[in-house]
Amino acid sequence: MSLVNFSMTDIARQISRPTFFLLLSVFLACTQSLDLRRLETVSMLGAELYSDSGGDSLLTGIGTRLSAEPNNLSILMEKGSALEGLRRYKEAVEIYSQCLVISPESPEILRRRGQRYISLRKLDNAITDLELAARHHTFIKAENLKYTENLNWAIWYYLALTYYLQADFENALTAFQRSYDYSADNVSLLASVNWIHNCLRRLGRSDEARQVVEPIKENMGYSGNYYKCILVYNGTKTELETINYNTVKGFEMCTIGYGMANFHWVNGDKEIALKIFRKIVAEETWQANGFLAAEAELSRIQ
């Protein structure tokens, strides 16, 4: 009997009942897990991008509280965050749209929805929201503020990223420079420096790009993937010391990989850059900024 013609009954005859039912339960669990994944959007390259499965118990608890207070912005925003964590960005956008009916000029809600429009590859929508957020927000420089709490920085940073994805490097540079001005911790500072450098290199302003990254050195208390990129940009480290393309995965692959690929691209090594771009978009972390950037690069040369 050909293996491809095996039915569940055929398999059951070949193995013990306990083993059969164990295998069946595993198969059904896997199938249900796959069914819970939702199609979120289509990439700039035409690939289908899916949400994560699970999280129902958390959402059920939030839903119970919302049923008692359906217009409670705090609970609605909590639900939006939970949906983001599951990469259910379409539903998160719907929640933030509901929030904006209640508070239509909220810079924080506009920023959150704008950021998730980026994840959904709706870049024009993202720019509209993020420009509105900048218009309605009162920017006051803060000190020692974690990047996740720094709305000043986040508005400019994600607006800049959207321009960058559209290859509008002049506007991206201006917005990234503003994000740098409002950075209040090492993470936000290094992220802004990284992208300012990339914009300047794309604009052919190599001397300025070197000046931006030159002050960042080892043993300054910095860390993270953007820091690793910057040390390559300024010649402190080599690419070989920084990333192993055979082992690195996920966000690290997307962030450092894009930085290195872009560095190759502006230095004229475009075939190497393209190879890395393609490796990045083979990852599962399709929400990562580096993934988005690599995807945008490849979409422009198809």
What does each model-found stretch correspond to?
Residues 81, 115, 161, 198-200, ...:
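Residue-level recognition of tetratricopeptide repeat
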Residues 30-78, 85-86, 302:
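N-terminal leader/linker segments that initiate helical-solenoid repeat arrays
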Residues 63-70, 135-149, 181-186, 245-246:
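Flexible helix-coil transition and linker loops at the boundaries of alpha-helical arrays
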